[in-house]
């Protein structure tokens, strides 16, 4: 019995070793888009849906959307995980946490991810891709929080920065895309082959 116990302990991985992910792939990491977004309701007061809808695209990529009953623009946000850091892209349209609990929601997702992957992240970066109200509304909820960096006025050193953000083996390319804002940015994630355009590109209606 003692020998079996010793073998079990010796085989237990150290924190942060088990979930180390190789973010280099020949093809895009698969993701799940089989779900439906909340459509809001005629009466915002009577709406009983969650304030922020969270969808797990894959094990290291999450999509968040603000409830249309809370704000008519219903902006999207994205939470990306690497082996050392996490990145929240955009911060929604509402400042008040009682109506739009962005920090609380993101913290819960991060906690579950850390527990599942046996990793304690070094830092969480919040990066709006522009300065529109629908991108920066919830920024204040993250200010002054330990291990959180808010990059509200992030300036690109060059037009295309291929080493702009390294989340721990998941390296994102940042592209300057001025349009609605002079400091507009787009992020390309080679691991998922997703281009996060924020307000710089919308499908026509």
Task: Annotate each predicted stretch with a short phrase.
Residues 3-12:
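Sec-dependent N-terminal signal peptides
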Residues 35, 57-64, 167-170:
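Short Pro/Gly-enriched beta-strand edge/turn motifs at strand-loop
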Residues 51-115, 186-200:
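Conserved beta-strand hairpin/beta-sheet module of binuclear metal-dependent hydrolase folds
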Residues 132-134, 178-182, 201:
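Catalytic metal-binding/acid-base residues of hydrolase active sites
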Residues 159-189, 194-195:
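Core dinuclear metal-dependent hydrolase active-site scaffold
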